[in-house]
Amino acid sequence: MADIFERLIKNYGPIGQHRERAHGYFAFPKLEGEIGSKMKFRGQEMIVWSLNNYLGLANHPAVRKADADATTKYGLALPMGARMMSGNSDLHEQLEAELASFEHKEDAILMNYGYQGIMSSIDAICGRHDVVVYDAECHACIIDGLRMLAGHRFVYKHNDIEDCEKQLLRAQALIDKQETGGILVITEGVFGMAGDQGKLKEVAALKNKFSFRLLVD
């Protein structure tokens, strides 16, 4: 019988085997300075591509003042605990209401981070009889969400509408055979790894031929 801990010591995995060169460089890098499009890395100013500060609001004076005021009033530990149990607050619900109003939606829900949001959405929407059809270059958060899926999934070639239609035909055939379930198509507005745009109009046009819901990351 193999010792699973012993295996971890002997096999560091595809990234771990480069740990001596990777650590502090392309794994766990240390950036210095204020949050921005340019920060210092190992003493040199670099362009930063991987921050979630998309709108550049992190250092806006009004945002920083709100951060400071909230820290003074509530401290850094409030709320504490899982939100469903003891971590909910009026501030959460107020922000959700404001976001929903801004987007002209009925309601909104906050997640800790976008990765969790997509994973949770797939899990919440799809059941074991449902089928997901998704682009081959979807982000890792979508792939991880699909790993939790009890139902079937079909992948189509990146931005290939003809192949997407083929996979929809397979999905529809499976739904017809099961006599239950629905179809969810997943793609992205802008593919984060390559930077190209998803063919949203073309995918949406397939709704003229097939019955499915569309999830765009």
Which residue ranges define each predicted feature?
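N-terminal "arm"/small-domain region of PLP-dependent enzymes with the aminotransferase-like
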Residues: K10-L78, F212
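Short, structured coil segments at secondary-structure junctions
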Residues: R128, M148-A150, F210
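Conserved PLP-anchoring active-site segment centered on the Schiff-base-forming lysine
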Residues: I122-A140
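Short glycine/serine/threonine-rich phosphate/pyrophosphate-binding segments
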Residues: L110, Y115-S121, C141-I142, M193
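Active-site phosphate-binding strand-loop segment of PLP-dependent enzymes
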Residues: F154, N159-L215
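Short, small-residue-enriched loops and turns at beta-alpha junctions
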Residues: G56-L57, M84-N88, A140, I161-E162, ...
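Conserved N-terminal alpha-helix of the aminotransferase class I/II PLP-enzyme fold
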Residues: K65-Y113
